[in-house]
């Protein structure tokens, strides 16, 4: 199979590995990009798991909260300049308010925009003409608890409840809701910083777990040690993996000497009753969106030729 220069460049951008290593990885995996990333990781050449999540898109994350509930939305724009526009910010804030009532992306898109007979989708389409850029309502989600609090945090907020990264944390408790919300906000800040994969180990996608095990096994076998020792090595690395990606097992950012789970237990004294983190949501602007890269020099040359 012929491997193109574009494929090699894409793999290099994802992993930071050398061109020859990227070409070898693609040859070994018949051009399968995901398998090539794993091949490089197994060889110890790539730190792709840290780089593959890089994404790019503009717009804002919006957060709105009520009594024991909160919602988070993402509305995209073409440029960061528009994201700083007051009219655009008002749209995102209003969409977040709608999300607090309707929750899901589909329901919010079809719901009436505040103060209008038009839907959220149609209102955003109309705004394209006035703001002068392509805009899009991408997603929304909501968390609710019967008792307790849903805490919120917006990182580097450009306005109240608006920024590039928004987090919700649901804490169920019959204790003091103000104390639960205060601790929940600390956990939300932690989630913003660490981006855990799941709340508990059981909630991690089994395919992701098996993938990590396979990579750790291949890495351990390169040591040449007996199978029994390799098994112990893999167990140790999986334990560390869970400590890195499972929220409750992570070292608490505000006090790295304890886990989030232990911090929750300690917070129960202030809350005045048993408490449980039941869910969290983390919306980072542009996750999973590939932003088209443009060659400025080529654009200028093309414009001159017209």
UniProtKB/Swiss-Prot annotation:
Record-linked InterPro entries: EF-Ts_dimer_sf, Transl_elong_EFTs/EF1B, Transl_elong_EFTs/EF1B_dimer, Transl_elong_Ts_CS, UBA-like_sf
Domain of life of the organism encoding this protein: Bacteria
Keyword Cytoplasm: yes
Main location: cytoplasm
UniProt KW keywords: Cytoplasm, Elongation factor, Protein biosynthesis
Region of interest (Involved in Mg(2+) ion dislocation from EF-Tu), residue spans: 79-82
Subcellular location: Cytoplasm
Molecular-function GO terms, alphabetical: translation elongation factor activity
Gene3D superfamilies listed in its UniProt record: 1.10.286.20, DNA helicase RuvA subunit, C-terminal domain, Elongation factor Ts, dimerisation domain
Pfam families: EF_TS (PF00889)
A GO CC term assigned to this protein in UniProt: cytoplasm
Entry similarity comment: Belongs to the EF-Ts family.
Role description: Associates with the EF-Tu.GDP complex and induces the exchange of GDP to GTP. It remains bound to the aminoacyl-tRNA.EF-Tu.GTP complex up to the GTP hydrolysis stage on the ribosome.
NCBIfam families for this protein: tsf
Name of the protein: Elongation factor Ts
Protein species of origin: Mesorhizobium japonicum (strain LMG 29417 / CECT 9101 / MAFF 303099) (Mesorhizobium loti (strain MAFF 303099))
């Amino acid at each position: 199979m012929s491997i193109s220069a574009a494929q090699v460049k894409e793999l290099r951008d994802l992993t930071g590995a050398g061109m020859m290593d990227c070409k070898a990885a693609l040859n070994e995996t018949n051009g399968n990009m995901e398998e090539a990333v794993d091949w490089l990781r197994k060889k110890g050449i790539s730190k792709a798991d840290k780089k593959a999540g890089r994404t790019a898109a503009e717009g804002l994350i919006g957060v709105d909260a009520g009594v024991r509930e909160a919602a988070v939305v993402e509305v995209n724009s073409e440029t960061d300049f528009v994201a700083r526009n007051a009219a655009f910010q008002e749209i995102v804030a209003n969409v977040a308010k709608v999300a607090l009532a309707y929750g899901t992306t589909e329901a919010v898109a079809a719901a009436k925009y505040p103060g209008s007979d038009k839907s959220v989708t149609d209102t955003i389409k109309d705004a394209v003409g006035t703001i002068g850029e392509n805009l899009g309502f991408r997603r929304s989600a909501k968390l609710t608890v019967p008792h307790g609090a849903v805490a919120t945090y917006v990182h580097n907020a450009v306005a109240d409840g608006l920024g590039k990264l928004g987090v919700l944390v649901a804490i169920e408790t019959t204790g003091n809701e103000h104390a639960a919300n205060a601790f929940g906000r600390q956990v939300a800040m932690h989630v913003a910083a660490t981006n855990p994969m799941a709340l508990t180990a059981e909630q991690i996608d089994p395919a992701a777990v098996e993938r990590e095990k396979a990579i750790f096994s291949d890495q351990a076998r390169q040591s040449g040690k007996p199978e029994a020792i390799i098994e112990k090595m893999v167990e140790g690395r999986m334990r560390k993996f869970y400590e890195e990606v499972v929220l409750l097992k992570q070292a608490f950012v505000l006090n790295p000497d304890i886990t989030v789970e232990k911090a929750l237990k300690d917070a129960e004294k202030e809350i005045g009753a048993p408490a449980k983190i039941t869910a969290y949501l983390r919306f980072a602007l542009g996750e999973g969106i590939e932003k088209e890269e443009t060659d400025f020099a080529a654009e200028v040359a093309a414009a001159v030729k017209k």
